[in-house]
Amino acid sequence: AMGAEVVLTRSDVGKGHPEYYQDLAAKIAADTPGAYFINQFGNPDNPAAHQASTGPEIIEQMAEAGGFDAIVFGCGSSGTMTGLSRCFAEHAPQVELVLADPGGSILTQYINEGVLSDKSGSWLVEGIGEDFLPSAMDITVVDAIERAGDRESFLWARQLVRQEGIFAGGSSGSAIAGAIKYCRKLPAGRIPVVILPDSG
């Protein structure tokens, strides 16, 4: 409808391969007059937007509800995670940051063991999980991590639409799955916020 050319990329190659989606996007931008590669994985404006906008909005809305204790999110480009962590460090330092990470992503092993694997697994949930560490990422801010498999993520997304009328994708289901697992470990009365990265 807008006249753009859609370029499909391979999912079986890693960063550094010319057909990896980010490498190919950078090449297309470099080869196309007037094009610009936004590079959300390395662009400091990505986390800055969440620090300046998303974080204060959550704090303001949750103040009206009596506050909150944790925030659960998935990590793709890391903009949400890094930006919120900066905002909360200044304005709500008591809030725990909880990452919901799909099976196959390298982030769980890196956070839990300090081991950065050069081989990721595969997962079906789109938009979250990593096979590399984005340069815009500050992974040190994560207080807890919960694995969220494909099946449970998609089931939670379906339950979200059936029960709440919110049309959201698998990454939102992962966030719900991670939040449920995290909350089961906590004493009653703790209040989490869960980021659903969909327009639903």
Q: Language-model segments: what does each one mean?
A:
Residues 122, 177-200:
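Phosphate-binding loop/pocket of nucleotide- and phosphate-handling active sites
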Residues 32-78, 84, 139, 143, ...:
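Active-site/ligand-binding-proximal alpha/beta "capping" segment
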Residues 1, 74-85, 107-108, 171-179:
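Short glycine/serine/threonine-rich phosphate/pyrophosphate-binding segments
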Residues 10, 39-40, 73-75, 99-101, ...:
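Short beta-strand segments
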Residues 22, 29, 34, 89-170:
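Active-site/ligand-binding loops adjacent to catalytic centers
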Residues 68-70, 95, 170-174, 182:
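Terminal helix/beta-alpha structural elements that buttress the NAD(P)+-binding lobe
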Residues 2-24:
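A glycine-rich helix N-cap at a beta->alpha junction
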Residues 5, 94-96, 191:
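Residues at the starts of beta-strands that form the adenosine-phosphate
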